[in-house]
Amino acid sequence: MDKKASRIRRATRARRKIAELGATRLVVHRTPRHVYAQVIAANGSEVIAAASTVEKAIREQVKYTGNIEAAKAVGKAVAERALEKGVSTVAFDRSGFQYHGRVAALADSAREAGLKF
């Protein structure tokens, strides 16, 4: 089993548990160059809020899009957008990525901006 298959297996298991809870989830995806975050409704069919380093507004705030500072900017932006839509509590879905570095920075930034998880 390669690295990507292992990550997807971990992500599937976590998503199954979150679905059983029926919770709105904050999903994180990372690539070497970008970080993406979405708040997805409990039924899984609607994206309530989203932010990523691909967006021009966030790219202008940061020097490089693939580092911890960029992840913090994405976390703050997605939390603010979710709170505007009335979502304050979410389950954190790290998509099988290790809770470390950019993933942890995004989560901490979203918490500081007012999102509860």
UniProtKB/Swiss-Prot annotation:
GO cellular component terms, A-Z: cytosolic large ribosomal subunit
Gene3D superfamilies in the record: 3.30.420.100
Recorded GO MF terms: 5S rRNA binding; structural constituent of ribosome
Disulfide bonds: none
UniProt xrefs under Pfam families: Ribosomal_L18p
CDD domains per record: Ribosomal_L18_L5e
Gene Ontology BP terms: translation
Keyword annotations of the record: Ribonucleoprotein, Ribosomal protein, RNA-binding, rRNA-binding
Superkingdom of the source species: Bacteria
Function: This is one of the proteins that bind and probably mediate the attachment of the 5S RNA into the large ribosomal subunit, where it forms part of the central protuberance.
Entry similarity comment: Belongs to the universal ribosomal protein uL18 family.
HAMAP family with a match to the protein in the record: Ribosomal_uL18_B
Oligomer status and interactors: Part of the 50S ribosomal subunit; part of the 5S rRNA/L5/L18/L25 subcomplex. Contacts the 5S and 23S rRNAs.
Full protein name: Large ribosomal subunit protein uL18
Lineage: Bacteria, Pseudomonadati, Pseudomonadota, Gammaproteobacteria, Vibrionales
Gene name of the record: rplR
